[in-house]
Amino acid sequence: MKSEDAEPRKEEKPTQKEETKALREWLVGQQQAIRTAGMPIIVLVEGWAAAGKGSLINELISEIDPRFYNVVSPVITPEADARYPFLYPYAKAIPENGKIMFYDSGWMEDTVRKYLRREITKEQYKARIRSVNEFERQLRDGGYLLLKLFLDIGRGEQRKRMNALRESFETEWRVSADDLWQQREYDAFKETYRGFMEKTGKAIPWHTLDGGDRKEAVHDALQLLVDLLQKAMEKGRYVGKPFQESFPLLHMKKLSEVDLSPALTDEEYKTELKKLQKKLGKLHNVIYRKKIPVILCYEGWDAAGKGGNIRRIAKPLDPRGFDVMPIASPEPHELNRQYLWRFWTRLPRSGHICIFDRTWYGRVMVERLEGFCAENDWKRAYNEINEFERQLTEWGAVVLKFWIHIDQETQLARFNDRQNTPEKQWKLTDEDWRNREKWPLYEAAVDEMLAKTSTKNAPWFIIESNDKKYARIRTLQIVIDALEKACEAH
């Protein structure tokens, strides 16, 4: 019989096991809501070798629909990927809207190991830190949810786990030479890991989990992921505000100030074209041998002559060493990712040339003027593009950007010529005529683009193209001059 004076029974707290089960059930139950909301989620799992990163990811995905997530291990970089920029394997793996991507180690592990092996210098290490902060911030500002976890274990525990793995023929392969090196250099890794997290944890924090207690690590990781998702579902998709970093910008003329009268005779054109193409062909062999990547970006008015200009650049090149990337309206799977993704995935390998016919600058022109992105998005893009191009030039790429320029009268004459010539009619679309009506708006957008994104290392060149022959020769001269300087510097 219960005494009236007895204290009321305290409600028992759920056990860790019960909490973990509830968190997992919530995550499973919200899959469709996350997909419908179009939330792209990245879970980066870093940590010590043998800390249980793979096991943790396996626990996190155990009840999730396999169509809803992917797991990648980009730290194991294939030789082919090693010929791309540092962030390439991570950027190309970002998920589509409404899906989760789990990275089994990533930009932290790759950077720390290369730094401690002295494969990158202190200055390169600093540049990587900056690039990581830019990359993470761009993802966040574009609506991505990013959870960064670090699994921590002590030196003794790591040694114990490695020894256990090495004792069995079935598991010894899981302990690599790099892992054993990390065990020997535990203190150096610990200090460098700490420094990396301090330098990259301000905008998007790191969360350290106790890898010594696997059940607790799973519980805490699920709790952090659920908290992140609940907050996002409550507040809606994050949209970053624009800001402008101080880049070394070059002074650019406004389009209205450009003299479009330069022209060449047929004889001058033929002589120069033959000489310059021969020189470019030889330079292509040198940049291939020296593994210098080259990125040529073409923008310009409709009918300005981009295609013909590109053909004169491409003709003397070895077809095995270059690509031309025509950029049209983004496909659905491209629209479902951060806008730079489709350009990250088209970058050339070192030693190769990539010619972009239209580029990432569509963000601040057609997408801006046609309302395909919000005002904050295109205003933020100037800085994001400068950061992207700085990462390319720090990788070693030669980046040249050409605005192929004509006046309105020349464009109208070329439009009429296309319309009246059957074999050219395919080049002219209704959209070309609509864009022509918006010439003043586009001109203002281009002037702003040139002023805000022509940097010392990735300059813009306005190519006078009322005379196509002159435009082709001038572009060839600029490309050859830049490649000669790059070859001399290597």
List the model feature ranges, each with a label:
Residues 1-490:
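Glycine-rich phosphate-binding loop of ATP-dependent small-molecule kinases
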